[in-house]
């Protein structure tokens, strides 16, 4: 039994028919070797297929192989282990301009005050979506203008509140218990994903018009990249940006180095 959606099945069948079947469909599965798979990889690269697509094809093949192995049709490990796949570059490049931020925040405010506030907080602190969702009043210090952010690995760092984020949080703050979340869903529970309002608004504003590379697409995480990019453009040194973002190594922060002013 599987929990796969029909769309996932459709894509896997399509990929199998387009790429795997022409090269290895005539072979008994036990006869398929790394050499056959190398030919598939080369053909995909020659036709300009992205590393992500190649990895998806090989993942589809692994599923078939693992099923065959589970049913004693084959006994050895999948030949994909001997094929070096191209690496996927998932480093996002996009950040918002000041004009884009202004129109985005204005549009969000008219649709959802909460999505506006979460977007503003991420733009001004560099917080990841998960850090925004986990923010409690106990780690927000309105007197000192700071907030303590905790990433998915349990590592804490301090964020410094701008006038805009300070004002926004002051409007939200009442006499909440320190353990209470700053942002909650309609039932008062922890938010688990950003509202579709963000994506719809980005689309309505045309912020992704003409964008074909997924790394250039404007998504909620673009707010974090915008925070970092603006800091570097304003002359903040990379080591300070590293600390503000909570990066584990300076190499992660160096993606912004080309934005430094001359």
Q: What kind of feature is each model-predicted range?
A:
Residues 37, 61, 97, 198, ...:
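Mobile genetic element proteins and their domesticated derivatives, centered on retroelements
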């Amino acid at each position: 039994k599987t929990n796969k959606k029909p769309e996932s099945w459709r894509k896997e069948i399509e990929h199998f028919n387009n790429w795997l079947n022409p090269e290895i469909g005539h072979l008994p599965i036990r006869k398929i070797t790394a050499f056959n798979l190398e030919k598939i990889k080369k053909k995909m690269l020659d036709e300009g297929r992205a590393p992500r697509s190649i990895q998806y094809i090989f993942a589809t093949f692994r599923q078939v192989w693992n099923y065959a192995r589970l049913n004693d049709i084959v006994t050895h490990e999948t030949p994909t282990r001997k094929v070096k796949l191209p690496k996927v570059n998932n480093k996002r490049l996009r950040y918002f301009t000041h004009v884009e931020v202004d129109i985005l925040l204005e549009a969000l405010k008219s649709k959802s005050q909460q999505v506006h506030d979460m977007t503003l907080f991420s733009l001004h602190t560099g917080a990841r979506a998960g850090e925004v969702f986990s923010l409690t009043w106990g780690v927000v210090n309105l007197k000192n203008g700071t907030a303590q952010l905790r990433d998915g690995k349990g590592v804490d760092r301090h964020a410094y509140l701008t006038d805009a984020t300070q004002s926004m949080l002051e409007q939200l703050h009442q006499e909440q218990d320190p353990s209470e979340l700053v942002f909650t869903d309609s039932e008062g529970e922890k938010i688990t994903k950003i509202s579709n309002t963000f994506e719809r608004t980005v689309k309505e504003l045309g912020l992704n018009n003409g964008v074909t590379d997924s790394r250039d697409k404007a998504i909620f995480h673009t707010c974090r990249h915008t925070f970092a990019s603006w800091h570097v453009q304003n002359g903040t040194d990379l080591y300070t940006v590293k600390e503000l973002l909570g990066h584990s190594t300076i190499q992660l922060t160096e993606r912004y180095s080309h934005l430094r002013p001359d």
